[in-house]
């Protein structure tokens, strides 16, 4: 069953506007059990205020808290999705006299396994704060500053427990062998910050229309994780990491990266028929070595509204507009994991026993790195035509494109196995593609 409860309020006047909302959602999972559940609580608020004629401030807040539980198949359970077993083996308990023991045990049916299954718990909390400041120092000129902060924390814990049942061959089994029951907990933290500031100028002089925009962008992202597991709980009713008597394992992880960019755009139109747009980005990413972090990515597009020319007046009765366009652009791709340009060594426990029954740590060979490691560049050429006809009822768009990716990061060389590590990533691969796309749309109305 799914339940949603929401409440909202909004209001304001000429200078201040606001809205607030809250919600509660409950949902049962597909399995018929109280162990499979999801619940989410959320609240949001938005305020926009015209402080004066030249300054407007906006604030947006969002908080979400979600809890999820679900049964987990562990050890010898053999799953609770095998519904075919229901027709062959009875629900309830198998008499101990048949099993050769004193106690009656539940049979290994999906229903029993689901009823006895241990439960995993996950809590996720998300906080988002964003602000927007708009300044209007002069007519046709605006300056906008934006900031966004995202925070996501996830915490989970699980205990495998131990219970006894009768398997399909009428043998008494434990779900987890003695001393192999385990308790684990995991915590992850994600943080994201983004700052944008840009300026727009929009003006028209007679037949000339001019727009200009320039700005700065900076983003940062960090990820932190912690995972711990211990076997053999001394107090199963209150599982904990400190209460484990068996093997313990702990792992953690951390990564971060930042992006810094400058960008600009220039638009010019003459009589709204001859169109020109110039774009440029200068992007830097911490995912690349210090001397190769920045790249410049320009683009250009032109358009001609042919249907607005005088020599096309003969087609006005059926042709509403026709536009020819062409563009060339390049963008950078940095969709890789951080630290790929660093040579690292991994430390892990050995499976080899030495004197005094002690294990030693093993350090892997350092990875190879390449001096060629920077942005991938995606270049695209596009030719297109837009047609509107028959009183805007028929619309057609046709595009032909050619795309090329230069300097794709790939394993550029073959490394002998005796080296003990993999080949380094290099900007050594290229990829080309081309194609066309046609889109036809008909819009009409029949009757009233």
What are these model-derived regions, one by one?
Residues 167-168:
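Intrinsically disordered, compositionally biased low-complexity regions
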Residues 31-35, 287-290:
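Short, surface-exposed loop/turn segments at secondary-structure junctions
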Residues 1-34, 73-74, 116, 134-136, ...:
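Residues embedded in well-ordered regular secondary structure
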């Amino acid at each position: 069953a799914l339940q949603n409860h929401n409440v909202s309020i909004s209001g304001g006047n000429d200078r201040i506007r606001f809205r607030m909302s809250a919600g509660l959602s409950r949902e049962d999972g597909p399995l018929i059990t109280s162990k499979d559940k999801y619940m989410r609580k959320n609240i949001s608020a938005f305020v926009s205020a015209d402080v004066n004629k030249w300054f407007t401030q906006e604030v947006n807040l969002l908080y979400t808290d979600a809890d999820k539980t679900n049964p987990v198949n562990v050890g010898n359970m053999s799953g609770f999705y095998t519904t075919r077993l229901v027709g062959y083996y009875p629900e309830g308990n198998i008499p101990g006299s048949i099993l050769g023991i004193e106690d009656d045990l539940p049979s290994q049916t999906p229903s029993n396994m689901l009823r006895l299954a241990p439960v995993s718990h996950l809590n996720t909390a998300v906080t988002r704060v964003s602000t927007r400041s708009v300044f209007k120092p002069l007519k046709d000129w605006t300056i906008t500053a934006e900031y966004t902060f995202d925070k996501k924390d996830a915490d989970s814990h699980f205990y495998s427990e131990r219970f006894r049942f009768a398997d399909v061959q009428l043998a008494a089994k434990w779900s987890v062998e003695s001393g192999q029951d385990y308790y684990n907990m995991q915590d992850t933290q994600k943080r994201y910050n983004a700052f944008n500031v840009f300026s727009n100028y929009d003006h028209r002089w007679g037949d000339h229309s001019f727009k200009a925009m320039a700005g700065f962008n900076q983003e940062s992202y960090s990820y932190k994780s912690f995972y711990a597991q211990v076997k053999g709980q001394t107090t199963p009713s209150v599982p904990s990491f400190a209460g484990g008597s068996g093997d313990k394992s702990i792992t953690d992880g951390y990564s971060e990266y930042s992006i810094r960019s400058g960008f600009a755009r220039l638009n010019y139109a003459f009589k709204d028929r001859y169109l020109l747009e110039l774009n440029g980005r200068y992007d830097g990413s911490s995912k690349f070595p210090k001397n190769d972090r920045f790249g410049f990515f320009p683009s250009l597009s032109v358009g001609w509204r042919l249907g607005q020319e005088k020599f096309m007046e003969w087609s006005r009765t059926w042709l509403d507009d026709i536009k020819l366009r062409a563009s060339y652009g390049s963008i950078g791709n940095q969709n890789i994991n951080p630290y790929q340009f660093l040579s690292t060594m991994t430390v892990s426990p050995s499976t080899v026993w030495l004197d005094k029954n002690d294990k030693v740590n093993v350090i892997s060979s350092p990875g190879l790195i390449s001096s060629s490691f920077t942005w991938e560049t995606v270049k695209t050429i596009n030719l297109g035509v837009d047609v509107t006809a028959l009183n805007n009822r028929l619309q057609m768009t046709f595009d032909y494109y050619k795309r090329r990716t230069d300097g794709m990061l790939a394993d550029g060389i073959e490394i002998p196995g005796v080296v003990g590590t993999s080949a380094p990533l290099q900007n050594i691969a290229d990829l080309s593609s081309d194609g066309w796309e046609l889109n036809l749309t008909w819009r009409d109305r029949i009757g009233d």
